[in-house]
Curated annotation (Swiss-Prot):
InterPro entries (UniProt xref): Acetyl_CoA_COase_a_su (IPR001095), ClpP/crotonase-like_dom_sf (IPR029045), COA_CT_C (IPR011763)
Keywords: ATP-binding, Cytoplasm, Fatty acid biosynthesis, Fatty acid metabolism, Lipid biosynthesis, Lipid metabolism, Nucleotide-binding, Transferase
Chief site of localization: cytoplasm
Sequence ranges assigned to domain CoA carboxyltransferase C-terminal in this UniProt record: 38-292
Pfam family, one: ACCA
E.C. number: 2.1.3.15
Gene it is expressed from: accA
A biological process term (GO) from this entry: fatty acid biosynthetic process
Entry keyword annotation includes Zinc-finger: no
Localisation: Cytoplasm
Ranges in a coiled coil: none
Name of the protein this chain belongs to: Acetyl-coenzyme A carboxylase carboxyl transferase subunit alpha
GO cellular component terms, semicolon-separated: acetyl-CoA carboxylase complex
Amino acid sequence: MSTELDFEKPIRDLKGKIEELRTFTEEKEIDLSDEIEKLEKRLHALEENIYGNLKPWQRVQIARHGERPTTLDYIEQLFSDFLEMHGDRLYGDDEAIVAGIAKYKGQPVTVIGHQRGKDTKENIRRNFGMPHPEGYRKALRLMKQAEKFHRPVICFIDTKGAYPGKAAEERGQSEAIARNLLEMAGLKVPIVCIVIGEGGSGGALALGVGDRIHMLENSTYSVISPEGAAALLWKDASQAQRAAETMKITAPDLKELQIIDDIIPEVRGGAHRNVAEQAEAIDQVLEKSLKQLSSLTTEELLNKRYEKYKKIGEFSHVNDAISVN
């Protein structure tokens, strides 16, 4: 059973009441089907109300859920013949990034993604999904290989950010991220990026320069965490909920700002409720994106990518005079 979040307590309590009635019915052999049916209708309405009106901070909580599907979960669901590749050929291998070749509906593709752990031991091994420079350089090595063999690149984004430790800085963290941005902008094959959890700062962006950028409904994409923003703006990390509402980090906000292309609907309650069903929703958008991009010539692909990023952040001057009393 999935771990419930704080705001889901009313749902949890009502489910508990329904389960109690079912147990009572079985033990006492009393027909309470009408009462159970009424409670189930109330439960459905409650879920619709809560999950249909999620606040930014609640989406952050879902994006961070410990049982949320990872890159490897989606690779297992969406691709066949996945062969993971290791190492950047410069320093070492970084398990915070998974990269390899696979087949998607019979088509050879390159798949790259952040990978966090499912428990403490795996999180330590994968550095909690926060890559070192060798992780980004491994990703770039696979991207250049994909370009050589004309394979589309599919990136799954799910990280709190690039690892900010001393060793990472010594090995050129900022250069590795910047190099990926530069190379992805000119990569001569289709790139589809999907934010499946947290999209944290440059650590996410280093896998996020694509021809299509999609987000799961309850994922986030931001330049800094809400806690970090709150600490900077108000000197109080406990103001994270307020920061999340101000920062415009959710999929609906970023769709409105034209940062992303599509919002992928999530299973009610979050992707962790049903991985297979969530993968089907991703599959529909991914197939459509690859079909559209594969029909373009290399020149058309690069020109459209250039125009896509050129218009992000455009603004208009307001010429109306402002009077100050």
